Amino acid sequence: VFGAHFPATLDGNPNCTDGNNSFEVFGGVHFVAAHGERVRQHRDKLSPNVVDNVDRGLAYNLEDVAIAHLQQSKIARNWLDLFEEVDVVICPAASTSPFPHNQWSVAEIDDAKMATYMRWLAITYLPTMALASAVVLPCGIDDQKMPFGIQILSAPGRDQLVIQVAKALEDVLASHPATMRPIPDLTKLTS
């Protein structure tokens, strides 16, 4: 739908090997700092995701953190190299359809079990490892009749470019019934 609105497009992605490990190590360490005491005192009252992150963070050692740092640096370089070749990357905002709020996470995608509760978010968190500028736009509905979104990414500090591309794409998407922003029927939601 929107490829024709760019001078050139190409399919590809940066090498994000080990990105999941790096993200999960840093996430776990952060959760220990932010929520460790809370988990020690109130483990039974907290979400299983908070508890999982703290437990995961406590299980890592300094070598794990050092390796995660090297992995993150490689991934950031790969993203930055890609942003030398292209102005923006456009990809789905999530790997799944929206799911019920009482479901803590996605356990599997396309019959592949997720190794951790957060793995389904990889398409969103991997670009953050390079501090990518990002915007998320609604882009119609998916095959399950649920809202679908795309993310527009560029190099760190290119927020203005990302916003300009997002605005232009928003106008293009709004002109096609299949990609226009879905407006919920509020009467159905309140009945």
Feature-to-residue mapping (PLM):
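Short helix-loop capping/hinge segments that flank enzyme active sites or metal/cofactor-binding pockets
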Residues: T9-N13, E24-R77, P92, T96, ...
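Flexible, glycine/charged-enriched surface loops at secondary-structure junctions
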Residues: F2-N13, H176-I183
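Short, surface-exposed loop/helix-turn segments at secondary-structure junctions
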Residues: N21-F26, I67, F99-W120
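Short, Asp-centered acidic motifs that coordinate Mg2+ and/or phosphate
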Residues: V88
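Structural helix-boundary/capping segments
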Residues: R56-L70, R77, E85, T128-S191
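Hydrophobic alpha-helical segments in the ANL/AMP-binding
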Residues: Y117-A130
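Tryptophan-centric aromatic hotspots in well-structured domains and transmembrane helices
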Residues: D52, A76, S105, W120-L121
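Short, active-site-adjacent cap segments at secondary-structure transitions
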Residues: C16-D18, T96-F99
